[in-house]
């Protein structure tokens, strides 16, 4: 009756997307030369030393030959296990023998096969062969003491296959949302098909990938933590079980389909014997992840050079984890957090040996990989099959290509962008540590108990090696249930056969060796990214000569090279607009779907406040506002990184180039602004201003063509706020900086017809305005003096081109040496202006009256008279065109509210609140009482927030 119920419900419980799994009892045969083909039950790692081993497993009408060697790659030299909390009965510390348990290899000499097994306590682990996965584990009495063992060494082999067609749309088993973020968009941008539009006359986009273009081995130093529920469930076998999972995950990351040499290295295992020893674990996956991340951060070492420092941490628990909408969640991690000590972590719900795939999946998220079904992936690569590692359902894995093209592209971009630099430090020395197939260690019954709890048994009539169906109870009746994973690799599926990659395979072709990858020849250079003005061409090579196989190393070294092309200036460059300006202008009229901007918005490049890492993004500001956005993840190749730099952007990375536009060139502008010049084609102009009047004072007029401009205003007695501020006007008299009695306290970049001037802001003891390249428009420098009228000290210098045929005899040398004139008089090092005779009458201005406003926009007046040489008033005698102004704007800036960032939300779900602090800040950064700021315009200090529904 019980059997009938199982049969009925096994068919009723079948889900779309795959047939029932298969299983078979097998007896592994060791075929080493010293064994001579007899049936042999593995006693332990001491039997072989460091020699290779060969096992034959016959199952599912096939022979599987596992050619195994010790594998040391997934355990660090300083690997250790630590127990925290009160010891549990029956649990002992890890044995050093575990270091020699794990082996890896291949199956039947298939290029895409793999084997990862443990040889301690029986043959247990997993292997993959011809698209199927196999899990092998000893039957219960097979791991008994030697005197009680089954003389035949019986093992259970399970297999599951790769789906041949659509698999339906099962619920996602991952707690990470299948959305996209700007980093994913940036990573996939090079793959996107280009449409006709902006830049075709001046640029042509290329297809391809890579930024830093170098394939470098990465070592992911990993902390593995098991909570109290894991300790109670697995007992003394826990450490071996965890390492079996990590061994399989490490093998997946060494597969060449990921296109990068990545090594998962375990540096420490922590076993938590009681709840108080570790982080708080609940059914809320997001909260558990947050608790674990904070907990592991406190335990980690400060220095990355410490042998027990970890780059990422993984928590395993038997707690049923729930995501935002379902409790089918098997894991959760924050996306793109590798090398972030506070957030590089993941949480895994243990459901048996398939947790190895969940581990690899969640680590993929930490490496910034999204799910394969995100819209951006599908737009670039088409609809991807649901049998890759980053499928949200994670039901079937294509062992021939476990990583999709989208995942490989994104992790490559992530590493090339510098986000994985903490992974470059290599463990101090290699240790020969084994790697095994999980099916060699765990029977089919044990796999069911690991997945569904004590007492769960394999369902009868399963198809070998495909989905693992196990018994359970629902509403008092016996049912068959599955988590859509196959039998563990290495599970026996017939005489001379075992499960591998979900299929039952035979053993043959034993002498299969590891193949390291090697670079193929360089492809030809692609098209130039621009038709003029300096573009870039790329050439790449692939790791296909040969492709890595059987756990071999991925290629190391430069994978993409580049060169400059089409360096002749563009005809439209006379307009003075830079190529970056044109790229921003292409978005004019696009209001970014926000009501802050109108459809008439005009976009200009943003330079100030942009971090060096973001210089090759197209960051544009809405002209006349403070709003700015990333309008494109990368500028067109060949765009200057900044107006005062000769470096250019290549695939989103700033690459050094010469002033001639050639990548790798060492040519530089001299102080005259001449590319490759010798500093002899210009003359230096210097000056000093020290005696101002209240308001704006003329300092110097800088002609067009001036270069190496350096203007400095040193604060009175070293003070930061001495009430003297540099100001700048263009040739039309429009203020470009600190006009109308409004000054900038922060650093700013001013772009004037393509030339960049860097302003230090007023918050420094030495206020400066500098430009290295020649300016294309005459500018006027002034100094604004207010307040206590402390004397300014403005020094300026710049270089002007020499006259082509300058007659030095017409300018006799001043016996006093180079002239340095003061107070608003332009001076040349080889020329002195003679003062004009004083006219008989001149304008005389009185002192300024009080300001009409205490702060903000006020006015003040003064008397202006025309007086003769004797001081009498002679109104008609003065030139009206030179009459001084009688009225001017005045008033210091009013105190303003200074805001801090919002605090985190007080609740992880549901309605919470967040705060921020307010300060009333006066002119010069002085902290004032709140009532001195406009209370009617006081920003909000407290607000409600909802991170997600509970």
UniProtKB/Swiss-Prot annotation:
Residues forming coiled coils: none
Post-translational modification: The precursor is cleaved by a furin endopeptidase. Glycosylated. Can be O-fucosylated by POFUT2 on a serine or a threonine residue found within the consensus sequence C1-X(2)-(S/T)-C2-G of the TSP type-1 repeat domains where C1 and C2 are the first and second cysteine residue of the repeat, respectively. Fucosylated repeats can then be further glycosylated by the addition of a beta-1,3-glucose residue by the glucosyltransferase, B3GALTL. Fucosylation mediates the efficient secretion of ADAMTS family members. Can be C-glycosylated with one or two mannose molecules on tryptophan residues within the consensus sequence W-X-X-W of the TPRs.
DNA-binding is among the record's keywords: no
Chain segments carrying region Spacer: 701-838
Requisite cofactors: Zn(2+)
GO cellular component, one term: cell surface
Tissue expr: Expressed in fetal liver and kidney, but not in any of the adult tissues examined.
Predominant place of localization: secreted
Function: Metalloprotease which has proteolytic activity against the proteoglycan VCAN, cleaving it at the 'Glu-1428-|-1429-Ala' site. Cleaves VCAN in the pericellular matrix surrounding myoblasts, facilitating myoblast contact and fusion which is required for skeletal muscle development and regeneration.
Protein name from the UniProt record: A disintegrin and metalloproteinase with thrombospondin motifs 15
Species this protein is from: Homo sapiens (Human)
């Amino acid at each position: 009756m019980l059997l009938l119920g199982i049969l009925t419900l096994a068919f009723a419980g079948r889900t779309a997307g795959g047939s029932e799994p298969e299983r078979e009892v097998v007896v592994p045969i060791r075929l080493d030369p010293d064994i001579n083909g007899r049936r042999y039950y593995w006693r332990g790692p001491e039997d072989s030393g460091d020699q290779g081993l060969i096992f034959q497993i016959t199952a599912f009408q096939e022979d599987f030959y596992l050619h195994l060697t010790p594998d040391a790659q997934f355990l660090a030299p300083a690997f250790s296990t630590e127990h925290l909390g009160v010891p549990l009965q029956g649990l002992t510390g890890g044995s050093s023998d575990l270091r020699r348990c794990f082996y890896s290899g291949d199956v039947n000499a298939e290029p895409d096969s793999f084997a990862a097994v443990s040889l301690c306590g029986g043959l247990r682990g997993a292997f993959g062969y011809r698209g199927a996965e196999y899990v092998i584990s000893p039957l219960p009495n097979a791991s008994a003491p030697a005197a009680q063992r089954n003389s035949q060494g019986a093992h259970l082999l399970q297999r599951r296959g790769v789906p041949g067609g659509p698999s339906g749309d099962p619920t996602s088993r991952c707690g990470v949302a299948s959305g996209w973020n700007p980093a994913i968009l940036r990573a996939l941008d090079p793959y996107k098909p280009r449409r006709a539009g902006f830049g075709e006359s001046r640029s042509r986009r290329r297809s391809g990938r890579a930024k830093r273009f170098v394939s470098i081995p990465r070592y992911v130093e990993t902390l593995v933590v098991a909570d109290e529920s894991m300790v109670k469930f697995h007992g003394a076998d826990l450490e071996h079980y965890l390492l079996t999972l990590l061994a399989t995950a490490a093998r997946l990351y060494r597969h060449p389909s990921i296109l990068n040499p990545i090594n998962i290295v375990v540096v420490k295992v922590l076993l938590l014997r009681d709840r108080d020893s570790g982080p708080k674990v609940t059914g809320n996956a997001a909260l558990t992840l947050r608790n674990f991340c904070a907990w592991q951060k406190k335990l980690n070492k400060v220095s990355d050079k410490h042998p027990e420092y970890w780059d990422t941490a993984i928590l395993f628990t038997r707690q049923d984890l729930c995501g935002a909408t379902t409790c089918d969640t098997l894991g959760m991690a924050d996306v793109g957090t590798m090398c972030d000590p506070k957030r590089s972590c993941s949480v895994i719900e243990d459901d048996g040996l398939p947790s190895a795939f969940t581990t690899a999946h969640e680590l993929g998220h930490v490496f910034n990989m999204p799910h394969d079904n995100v819209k951006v992936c599908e737009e670039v690569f088409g609809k991807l099959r649901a049998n890759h590692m980053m499928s949200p359902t994670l039901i079937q894995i294509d062992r021939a290509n476990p990583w999709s093209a989208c995942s490989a592209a994104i992790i490559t971009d992530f590493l090339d962008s510098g986000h994985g630099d903490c992974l470059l430090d290599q463990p101090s020395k290699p240790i020969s540590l084994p790697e095994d197939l999980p099916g060699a260690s765990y029977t089919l019954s044990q796999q069911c108990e690991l997945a569904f709890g004590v007492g769960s048994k394999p369902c009868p009539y399963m198809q070998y090696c495909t989905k693992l169906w196990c018994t359970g109870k629902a509403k008092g009746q016996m049912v068959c249930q599955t988590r859509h994973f196959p039998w563990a690799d290495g599970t026996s599926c017939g005489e001379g056969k075992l499960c591998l990659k979900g299929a039952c395979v035979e053993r043959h072709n034993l002498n299969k060796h590891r193949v390291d990858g090697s670079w193929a020849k360089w492809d030809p250079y692609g098209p130039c990214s621009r038709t003029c003005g300096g573009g870039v061409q790329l050439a790449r090579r692939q790791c296909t000569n040969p492709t890595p196989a059987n756990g071999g190393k991925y290629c190391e070294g430069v994978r993409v090279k580049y060169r400059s092309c089409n360096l002749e200036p563009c005809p439209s460059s006379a307009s003075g607009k830079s190529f970056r300006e044109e790229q921003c202008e292409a978005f004019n009229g696009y209001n970014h779907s926000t009501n802050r901007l109108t459809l008439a918005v005009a976009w200009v490049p943003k330079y100030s406040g942009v971090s060096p890492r973001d210089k090759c993004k197209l960051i544009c500001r809405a002209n006349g506002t403070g709003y700015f956005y990333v309008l494109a993840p990368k500028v067109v190749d060949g765009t200057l990184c900044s107006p005062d730099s000769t470096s250019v952007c290549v695939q989103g990375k700033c690459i050094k180039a010469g002033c001639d536009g050639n990548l790798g060139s060492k040519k530089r502008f001299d102080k005259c602004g001449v590319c490759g010049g010798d500093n002899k084609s210009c003359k230096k102009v210097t000056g000093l201003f020290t005696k101002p009047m209240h308001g704006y004072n003329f300092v110097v007029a800088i002609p067009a063509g001036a270069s190496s401009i350096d203007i400095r205003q040193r604060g009175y007695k070293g003070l930061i706020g001495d009430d003297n501020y540099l100001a700048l006007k263009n040739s039309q008299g429009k203020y470009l900086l600190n006009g109308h009695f409004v000054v900038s306290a922060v650093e700013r970049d001013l772009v004037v017809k393509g030339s960049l001037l860097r302003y230090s802001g007023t918050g420094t003891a030495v206020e400066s305005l500098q430009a290295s390249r020649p300016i294309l428009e005459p500018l006027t420098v002034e100094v604004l003096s207010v307040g206590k009228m402390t004397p300014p000290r403005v020094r300026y210098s710049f270089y002007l081109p020499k006259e082509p045929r300058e007659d030095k005899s017409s300018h006799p040398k001043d016996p006093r040496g180079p002239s340095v004139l003061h107070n608003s008089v332009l001076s040349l090092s080889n020329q002195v202006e003679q003062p004009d005779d004083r006219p008989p009458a001149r304008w005389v201005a009185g002192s300024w009256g009080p300001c009409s406003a205490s702060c903000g926009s006020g006015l003040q007046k003064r008397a202006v008279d025309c007086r003769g040489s004797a001081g009498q008033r002679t109104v008609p005698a003065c030139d009206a065109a030179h009459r001084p102004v009688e009225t001017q704007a005045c008033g210091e800036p009013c105190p303003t509210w200074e805001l801090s960032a919002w605090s985190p939300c007080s609740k992880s779900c549901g309605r919470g609140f967040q705060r921020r602090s307010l300060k009333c800040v006066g002119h010069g950064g002085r902290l004032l009482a709140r009532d001195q700021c406009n209370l009617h315009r006081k920003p909000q200090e407290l607000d409600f927030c909802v991170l997600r529904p509970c």
